[in-house]
Design a protein with these regions (language model features):
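Solvent-exposed alpha-helix faces
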Residues: 39-43, 96, 108, 183, ...
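Conserved pre-ATP/AMP-binding loop-to-beta segment of ANL
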Residues: 13-16, 128, 141-145, 152-177, ...
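Conserved AMP-binding A3 loop
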Residues: 28-32, 165-166, 173-200
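Conserved AMP-binding/adenylate-forming core of the ANL superfamily
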Residues: 17-62, 66-70, 87-92, 96, ...
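AMP-dependent adenylate-forming
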Residues: 4-29, 133-135
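Conserved S/T- and glycine-rich ATP-binding loop of Class I adenylate-forming
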Residues: 55, 72, 103, 172, ...
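Hydrophobic alpha-helical segments in the ANL/AMP-binding
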Residues: 6, 46, 63-82, 91-92, ...
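Structural core segment of the AMP-binding/adenylate-forming
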Residues: 74-150
Length: 205
């Protein structure tokens, strides 16, 4: 997955990969933006001891939701995407079951997770994508942009851990919780091979 995005940036560069809405503004996110964000966030994960970690991501549509997904699995970690419409107690239960140690979330989740810090002692980092109005007083909150700044600084010193990390195609890289319509929700474990096969099939369809 990491190599696919690196080669896409080399081929498509400053072409727009995503248009997304930021309040009333429509912004562009290029292939180079995506790869740079992946490298910066992934390097910060290494620096913070979060490579190989299980990281939840929850919220509305945003390019950083996707870069979180791809960065985490590129460091040897496991991504745990959660529906932002879930009941907060169910969300906490899923993060506990998936053994998450960090959670990345968009502005719609501000306050909902940090207000339940006492129920999330296993979460070392709460990482808001849009930090405006978020409560940073708990000591475990660090904004997404601060992660990117930290990763960028490490890259400027020659840190290559993110791109050098070797990935086994058969390693688990994602846990997807089922809807639980016929019983309790189950965590489906997917490998890098599963994801790349799905991407390849989608391209061929």
């Amino acid at each position: 997955i990491r190599d696919l995005f690196r080669s896409s940036a080399q081929v498509f560069g400053d072409k727009v990969q995503y248009f997304y809405r930021d309040d009333a503004l429509v912004r562009e996110f290029t292939y180079n933006d995506f790869w740079s964000t992946m490298r910066e966030f992934g390097t910060a994960l290494f620096d913070r001891g979060l490579s190989n970690a299980h990281v939840a991501v929850v919220g509305d549509t945003h390019p950083y939701w996707v870069t979180t997904f791809t960065s985490v699995i590129s460091t040897g970690g496991v991504i745990v995407p959660l529906d932002h419409e879930l009941d907060i107690d169910e969300m906490i239960n899923f993060m506990r079951r998936a053994e998450c140690t960090a959670v990345v979330y968009t502005g719609s989740m501000n306050g909902r997770l940090t207000s339940r810090m006492n129920d999330l002692p296993f979460i070392k980092y709460f990482i808001p994508i849009s930090p405006a109005g978020e409560d940073f007083s708990g000591g475990r909150v660090m904004s997404y942009e601060d992660f990117l700044t930290e990763g960028r600084a490490k890259l400027e010193t020659g840190d290559t851990r993110f791109e050098d990390h070797e990935i086994s195609m058969d390693e688990m890289c994602a846990i997807l919780f089922t809807s639980g319509t016929t019983g309790s929700s189950k965590g489906v474990m997917l490998s890098h091979r599963n994801l790349t096969a799905a991407a390849d099939a989608a391209c061929r369809a």
